[in-house]
């Protein structure tokens, strides 16, 4: 993402309620609402330093990998609902997410029947993230909380 500091300040910076996922989407949506044009260059590439960005943590430990996947899953759904609620209103966000919630509940039941504990756990955490956002509670789950579930 490239923008100048003046534009960043006019838009109001990043929404500090969003910990992970949708922070750029939210910023661009607010910029558009203020009349700024948004351009996406698909050919642009960046190189991240080794393991510094949260999403590229280097680990070979299976438990750590699963916990990170669960953490990402929780924050993704929390942030997505928060974004929709913020920009389209609570009612439309609920309508949009109702089929998603039904699908999550279905998958929890499916993986419980199949005895796939890892996927059942992931979808339970995803449901928890969605419900937390629906209840207007902050994005507060971290790796320690994921480990304890």
Residue map of PLM features:
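Residue-level detector of alpha-helical recognition elements and their boundaries
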Residues: 22-23, 61, 95, 145
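Generic recognition of well-ordered alpha-helical segments
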Residues: 27-30, 79, 83, 129
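Active-site-adjacent helix/loop segment of glycosyltransferases
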Residues: 37-115
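Glycine-centered flexibility sites
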Residues: 12-13, 51, 129
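Terminal low-complexity segments of carbohydrate-biosynthetic enzymes
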Residues: 94-149
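Residue-level recognition of hydrophobic positions within alpha-helical transmembrane segments
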Residues: 5, 19-22, 76, 103, ...
């Amino acid at each position: 993402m490239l923008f100048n500091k003046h534009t960043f300040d006019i838009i109001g910076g990043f929404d500090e309620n969003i910990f992970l996922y949708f922070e750029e989407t939210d910023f661009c949506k607010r910029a558009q609402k203020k009349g700024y044009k948004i351009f996406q260059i698909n050919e642009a590439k960046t190189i991240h330093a080794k393991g510094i960005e949260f999403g590229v943590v280097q680990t070979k430990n299976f438990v750590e990998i699963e916990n990170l996947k669960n953490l990402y899953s929780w924050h993704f759904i929390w942030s997505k609902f928060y974004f929709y609620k913020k920009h389209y209103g609570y009612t439309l966000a609920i309508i949009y997410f109702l089929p998603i919630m039904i699908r999550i509940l279905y998958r929890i039941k499916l993986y419980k029947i199949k005895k796939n504990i890892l996927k059942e756990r992931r979808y339970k955490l995803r449901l928890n993230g969605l419900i937390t956002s629906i209840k207007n509670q902050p994005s507060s789950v971290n790796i320690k909380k994921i480990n304890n579930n």
